[in-house]
Each structure stands twice: as C-alpha cells, then as structure tokens.
Amino acid sequence: METIIRKIDKNQINQDVIEEAGNVLKQGGLVAFPTETVYGLGADALKEEAAKKTYAAKGRPSDNPLIVHIADYEDLKKVAVNIPPETDALAAHFWPGPLTMIFEKSESVPYGTTGGLDTVAVRMPSDPIAAALIRAAGGFVSAPSANTSGRPSPTTAEHVRVDLEGKIDMILDGGAVDIGLESTILDMTVEPPMILRPGAITADMFEEVIGPVGVDETLVNSESKQAPKAPGMKYRHYAPKAKMMIVEGNIREEILAIRQLAYAAHREGKEVGIIATGETVQFYNYCLLYTSPS
C-alpha cells in the first residue's frame, strides 16, 4: 500500500486536502492526523470493517477499545446514551480539549469500535485540523494513537511515517503536536466519575467543576488484579525501542551513576538521552530527551 502524505497548516487549512482525507475515511480507509495530544489513526467510527483495519494496522488486540472523536457537542447524543448531567459542565470547561469521557454506547456504534464493550469512549479534540477532518468524514472518527501497538505515541508526522508507512492510506502532516501526552480518560458510567487514565487534566481540575472524582484502583495499586477498563491500559504501552535504565538512590548517587553510564555509552559511540527533573538537569551534559517541570 502506498501511503499518501499531505502537508497541512492548522492556521490556514487547505480544504481540498481535508476533503481528500475525509473521502478516504468515508471509503473505509485509514488517515493519521494531528490532535493537540498526539497523532491519531483515524477511521470511520461507525463502520465495523474500519475498526478491523485499525486493529490490523496497529497490531492492536481487538478487545482494546478505540476512542470516538467528535467535532460538535450535539453529536455526543448520537453515539452515547444515558448521559449524566455533569457532562454538560465538564464539556463546557474541557471540550474541545484533552479529555475523553466514557458513556453507555448507542446502537449506532459497532462493537468493533468499542472492543466488545457496551460503553464508548468519546473525545472532542481542539486541534483545528482534527475538527475539520472529523466534519469532512461525517462527524465520527475513531482514533487511537497512530503507532504500532505498544510503541510510544507519535508527536510528529515523521514518527507516524517511520512506524506505519505502507500500512495506512494517508498521513496529514500538521507539524508537532502541542501537548504530547494522551488525553485523560474519565468514566462517566459510575458515581462519582472515575479517572481511568491520567493525562493533562487532573483530579483537582475536575473537582473544581463537578466535585470529587474517583481514581481507578489499577492506577494506584500496581498489584491490583482488577481489569483495566480504558483504551491503552490493558496491554503493554509506551515501550521505546532503545534500551532504558532506571537509576535509584539518593540524588548525589543517582547523578554520579547516571553520568558514568552516559559517559560509558557515549564512548561506545551510542546516542544517549537522559530523563531528568528541573532539580538535576543542570548536572548532565548529554542529549536530553525530556525535562520534567518539577
């Protein structure tokens, strides 16, 4: 399969490119596109066969549900039923944005999209390219992260190309994403609503809008036998290709050990990345992949 790559500017959207990508989705194809969180692998959320193609392209188990993306709030009622009253307040504060909410699914959503569950995960992305594509495709686009299952989520179109070229129909290259972290998932089928996957929107932020929320046991107890209920949490996730080491100890010991390991790898001609906090970043002189704000 030839993968078509189209450049697109979110500040000046080319409607011809959007219509081309929308037609690919309407015909059952797969299109990778940018959202504010990560690049998503889009398919028609209301077609069972499109869901099967998504699972095949990603090498993703078919019982791992997909998130349905919408561009207009009124469309939520077409894919979800028994929507709780708190939803309006949450949507007013956090949609469009990096929040996925789980509801009871409507009959229009196939079980292929929901991973065989009677619930559906729904999000309204804020990226204008994503919103335009969703509308052009008919309003409902399922979109897990656009990567091979288990790999780190892509934040650029090049990440998608390297991983999925030849497996999907099209990539919309809208540049680097804004957040780089997948959406927070909130289960609205329980009382109080429960966080199933952490993300940019925190429990404190939810509490300011609707009061206290719960946190899924699997997030706070690594020995929990409870089955994860959210997309991306049931199977191995965020697994980089490179070897990764975790160094533990007091700060002085950690810094010394990490510098020694990095120096030894550098001497062997290897590229080195160090994940560090703002407190210790100044002590490292090698390539830094990510710096935590705390």
Task: For the regions a language model picked out, list residue spans one by one.
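Active-site-adjacent structural elements in enzyme catalytic cores
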Residues: 1-292
